[in-house]
Amino acid sequence: MSPGEKATILARVETLTWRKRKALAELGIARSSYYRWRRGRSGAKERKRPWNRITPNEERRMLAVAREFPDLSSRQLSALITDNEGFAVSESSGYRILRREGLVKRQETQVMAADEYHNKTRRPHQMWATDASYFRVVGWGYYYLVTVMDDYSRFILGCKLQKDMSANSLIEVVQEAVDATGMTDVPVEHRTRLLSDNGAGYVSRVFRDYLRLVGIGHILAAPFHSQTNGKVERYQQSLKREVNQLPYELPSQLERAIADFVEYYNYRRYHKALGNVTPADVLYGRREDILRRRKEVQAQTIIHRRQYNQALNTEPVNTAPS
């Protein structure tokens, strides 16, 4: 029963000079409820809305975005809405609404990159990380996806399916990253370093000679400790989780699926460790402007919600009997 209906019943019963008990019985209202309403304990008065409650229009728009992008978590959805919808919604508020509507994304189990390389990078291209992961193509056997990631921004600079893990196959992908970034045009003292595991191709003389030729230093991860290269390991887990949902009968099909994921990961996936911006935002120096704009949107949202909810709280409740 709404507060307005309770107020109407109170007004009607108060006009009776006798037989209030009978009137309440006919209305199906317990006497205890009637006297509790009179004391204002249960909401015969309109309950005040919290000043920061999300507005109905904001909730409708948030749910529309959630249904358009069903794979986004409440954290990613919060960032997407703040960047594109003109209002902000917190991760916790978004989660409560998504849970109520049955739209909560399944929690993913991920390997944390806490034990990453001990010297943390402070700028893009200070260090790259490389690793490989295998994929099966039906009727074609196994392929190795060799990846080069910028450690600071987590941007994927190069990746390619290779038939083996030979030094030349690895060099081909590293050269792709070198060409994309113009690394050989950078003064030698400012060029990147490359972090890799101790695989045979990476520790070979051919690979070492190549790195020396392009002026890139080489860092080997601690043996039997894959989390030293944890960022690229975690990326590969995310990639395989998405790409391996379907079998592939041609290498070109797998290449297309990988390319689509890399484009999404680099340019559209909000990364928690990066402040809920994309790797491209960090690589190209856009992160601080984005975070500043988000604070402005959040401040404007707070002002609007306060005004909206305070206006509702001051509206009079009609208690006159009809």
Which residues does each predicted region cover?
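Basic, flexible linker segments flanking DNA-binding modules
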Residues: R38-M127, L283-I290
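Ca2+-coordinating acidic residues in Ca2+-binding motifs
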Residues: S33, Q76, S93, V206, ...
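Residue-centric detector for conserved, function-critical "anchor" positions
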Residues: M1-R47, N52-E68
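Residue-level signal for the short linker/turn that defines the boundary of a DNA-recognition helix
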Residues: T17-R19, L72, E249
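RNase H-like DDE/DDD metal-dependent nuclease/strand-transfer catalytic core used by mobile genetic elements
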Residues: A88-E91, L103-V104, Y117-L145, D151-Y264
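N-terminal alpha-helical segment
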Residues: E5, E58-E59, S73, P187, ...
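C-terminal domain-tail junction helix/linker
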Residues: R212-I216, Q237-S322
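Surface-exposed charge patches
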Residues: A11, K22, A79, R96, ...
